[in-house]
Amino acid sequence: MMTRGATRMTRTVLGHMGPRYFSTAIFRNDAGTGVMSGAAVFMHGVPANPSEKAVVTWVRHFPVMGSRSAMSMALNDKQHDKKAENGSAAATGGGDGGDEKSVVSYWGVQPSKVTKEDGTEWKWNCFRPWETYKADLSIDLTKHHAPTTFLDKFAYWTVKSLRYPTDIFFQRRYGCRAMMLETVAAVPGMVGGMLLHCKSLRRFEQSGGWIKTLLDEAENERMHLMTFMEVAKPNWYERALVFAVQGVFFNAYFVTYLLSPKLAHRIVGYLEEEAIHSYTEFLKELDKGNIENVPAPAIAIDYCRLPKDSTLLDVVLVVRADEAHHRDVNHFASDIHYQGQQLKDSPAPIGYH
C-alpha cells in the first residue's frame, strides 16, 4: 500500500503533468462552463443537472482524474432516471396484481394463465394440465425377462448386487428408499434421450420418437421424486448420499450407453423390476399399518389425476404401475438392439403409461 506521503507526491506530479498531456483549456474559464451547460440543454432539452455542473467544477480543478469521475456522475444520473421510469411503470401496471410480484422484462415473455377443466386456476408451474395422466393400474406386474445371454446376466446381477446395500441402509424406511430409487431411476431416460438427441443431430436423421419417450420417462420419474419429497423428509446425510450416488450412476450409465445401448436398457429394465418389488413391499407395510397412510400430496393428486380424498397408498399404486411401464419400454428397447436394429427403426411407444 502507498503511504500518505507517496499519495500526496503522486497527486502533485499528476497536477503538473496534467496541463501538458491533457488539454483542459476549454474548461479553465467561464466560457467552458457555458459550453458544458449549453451542451446539456442541447442534448437533454433541460438545464444541466447538478451532477453535470459538478462535473465542470471537478474537471476544472482536477483535470486528470476528472474524466473518470465525470463518467461516473453521468452514469449515476442515467441510473437515477431509469429507476424513476421503472417506478412509474410499476405504479401504472400494479392495478389488479395485488401482492403478487411480476417480472417486467424488455423481452415481453409473460407466462400464460392456465386453468383446470372446472375453470379454477392451475397452481403448478412445474407441469401443465395436458401433461397429467391417469395411470393404467391393470398392467401385469409379474412380467420378467429371463436373462439368457452374457450381457443379460451381467445386467441382472449388477442390479441385484445394488439391492443389498440399499436394504441394509434403508431397511424398513420405504419412504426414503423410494426417494433414493427415484433419484437414480430419473437418470437413464435423460442420458439416453440426450445421447439419441446428439446422434440425431450428427446423422441428420429422425429418432423414431425415442427421444421424447426417454425424456418423458425421466420427467415422470422426477415427478415421482417430487411426490415422495412431500412424504419423506430426508436427513442431511441422506441428501449427501443422493448427491454421491447420482454423480456416480450418471457417469457410469453414460459410459455404458455409449459402449452398449442394449446393455444399458437391459439394466434399466431390471432396475424397474426391482422398483416394482420395492413398492410392493411398501404397500404391504401400509396395509399392515406400520407406515401411516397419510393423505396424498397435492402434487400427486393433480399430476396423476387422483380423487381429492386419495391417500399415500393410492399414490404408491400409481407409481408402481408407472415403473412397470418403464420396465416394458426399456426391455423392448434392449430387444430392438439385440435383433440388430436401431431404435429409430421401430416406432417408440409415445405416451405408454
UniProtKB/Swiss-Prot annotation:
What is the name listed in the Swiss-Prot or TrEMBL entry for this protein? Answer: Ubiquinol oxidase 1, mitochondrial
Where is it chiefly localized?
Answer: mitochondrion
Q: Which InterPro entries does this UniProt record tie to the protein?
A: AOX (IPR002680), AOX_sf (IPR038659)
Where found, per UniProt? Mitochondrion inner membrane
- Which cofactor(s) does the record list? Fe cation
Q: What is the effect of changing C176A?
A: No effect on disulfide bond formation and on stimulation by pyruvate
> Which reaction is catalysed here?
2 a ubiquinol + O2 = 2 a ubiquinone + 2 H2O
Gene3D superfamilies from the xrefs?
Alternative oxidase
The record's cofactor note says:
Binds 2 iron ions per subunit.
Family listed: Belongs to the alternative oxidase family.
Transmembrane stretches in the record are 178-198, 240-260
